[in-house]
Amino acid sequence: MLASIPHMETLRSLPRNPDVVARHPSAEDLDAAQQLISSAQAGREHPQDRHYTDNGSRKSEAGAPHSHHEGEYPIVQTSETPMNGHHVEKTSPKSQKDTSFLGHSCSNCGTKSTPLWRRSPTGAMICNACGLYLKARNVARPTKRNRTQASPEAYHPQNQSVGSQPDPAVTGSEGCTGSCPGGGNCNGTGGAEGCDGCPAYNNRVYKSTARGNVAAHALNRAGNSDAVPSPEAEAPARNSGQPEGNMLVACQNCGTTVTPLWRRDENGHPICNACGLYYKLHGSYRPTTMKKTIIKRRKRVVPALRENSPTAATHSSHGSSASPEASSPATLAYSHDERHRYYSSEPVDQYHRISPAAQRPFGFAPPPVDFTNFNSGAVTLPHHPPPPRLLEPGHPPLSQFARRSISPSSSGNSKKRTLAEAGANTDTGPVPTTLEAGSNQLPPIVSSANPPPPARLSSISSILNHAHARDESRLDPSLAALGRQQQSQPHHPQSSPLAPTQAASQSLPGVSNMDNHVEDRRAKLQREAEEMREQLRAKERELAELAGQ
């Protein structure tokens, strides 16, 4: 590999364009070459670091030749794995290209590969994991978290510390038979239908099949350096690495191996989620008497599944009441139609004869203009006389728009009226059909025969305009005359359809009435101007008195 470095530098230094003069190697190229050389030297000095994933017997066989043949590392491999040794030597520089400077080792955990080298407050070189741990917790990262550390001296104290713990590891290994009852009561062993995505399912148990072989090899090397282990410890190690893998993770406080989330205490020891939350809230360790064998999970309801179910509006999968969002559009439309029929006081048989296609456009139409205070506070200019067709006294509202124009829902009033009040506003006798069928004019919206509801819909206008002091001088004389005629003439329900038209034609204002209206309007404006002048003089006198003081 060293022989290939000058060749690579020669190829890199060749110019791509023949017109360009050949350049010298830059500082970056020299730095890259120096890193490759240092990585090759580090591989020869520490060959045992590359065989921790192999069997312990292979390591013992290859240990002696490495000390004598230091420069012939690819050749001194045993006959069993010549290709494996060549592969390790070939891929070792590539696996260490993530480091910023090769040849370093973490002063805390001893690792030689990390995505980012950091500096401790004392100036020592530490890896990225130890640096982040130190920055977050202000304490050194525990070395037992480093999984790449494989020396027998490092595994010996771990086995002693784990072995000193009582029965939690045994219960964890015995509980891996898949006896979870499910239904929200979880013991972390799996076996139920919903255990696949359960957070309380111990991830050490869940992923033990992928890590079993590595854990078994590591513990076998630890067993070779110690005295003769007990048969109880050798049998699980030969079968699978699951019990040993589970023994490495247990709560330091209560000893449980089942938790939705593993936490760390202030000393870096693993604790379960319950003990961690208890310590965070109360500031003291959780009593062991509070330990439970079953973790109760919260029942989470998915809204999408509940809406798609056929019985979403009336039933729930967990026995809870249905939410307001689950009501169907048909129910909302039905309630809207019932409210509209309640306000319009239509007969039941007439309401059911109307087709749904005819009802739907009116339900989504914009609200009409409020003509509630038309008769009481309207002031008509002299050059804009009111249209005679819309002021005929004998015509009640003919269509659904007229009923909606005086309803509280269209006028913005949220107070409901009783059926008696609604019936009093719309009880005007039979509706003539000749004008609606043959006329191209709009139906009358408000007339003198259908006054607004007393003391409710015009309450704001009565407060502002002072109904007790109102006189007919503010109204149009033609409107006042029509109102007096309507009050003097009794209403005949059995009159013919042509009778209202004849009465309206006899009571239409003439040219003389318009002249009288202009004169009255001029006199009224003169009186108002005189009153304003008098008020202005009074204000000027007050200002003069204040200035004199």
Curated annotation (Swiss-Prot):
Pfam families: GATA (PF00320). GO terms for molecular function: DNA-binding transcription factor activity, RNA polymerase II-specific; RNA polymerase II cis-regulatory region sequence-specific DNA binding; sequence-specific DNA binding; zinc ion binding. Residues 40-100, 141-174, 223-244, 306-332, 375-459, 482-535 are annotated as: Disordered. One of its GO terms (biological process) is positive regulation of transcription by RNA polymerase II. Residues 511-549 form a coiled coil. It is found in: Nucleus. InterPro entries: Transcription_factor_GATA, Znf_GATA, Znf_NHR/GATA. Residues 309-331, 485-497 have a biased composition (Low complexity). It comes from the Eukaryota. Induction: Expression is induced in mycelia grown in high iron medium or transferred from low iron medium into high iron medium, and repressed in mycelia grown in low iron medium or transferred from high iron medium into low iron medium. Residues 383-396 have a biased composition (Pro residues). Residues 180-198 are annotated as: Cystein-rich region (CRR). The keyword Metal-binding applies. One of its GO terms (cellular component) is nucleus. The keyword Protein transport does not apply. Residues 43-72, 86-97, 516-535 have a biased composition (Basic and acidic residues). Residues 498-515 have a biased composition (Polar residues). Disruption phenotype: Leads to increased iron uptake. leads to partial derepression of triacetylfusarinine C (TAFC) and fusigen production as well as to cellular accumulation of ferricrocin (FC). Also leads to increased oxidative stress. Keywords: Coiled coil, Metal-binding, Nucleus, Repeat, Transcription, Transcription regulation, Zinc, Zinc-finger. A zinc finger (GATA-type) spans 106-130, 251-275. The conserved cystein-rich region (CRR) localized between the zinc fingers is also involved in DNA-binding and transcription repressor activity. This is GATA-type transcription factor sreA. It comes from Emericella nidulans (strain FGSC A4 / ATCC 38163 / CBS 112.46 / NRRL 194 / M139) (Aspergillus nidulans).
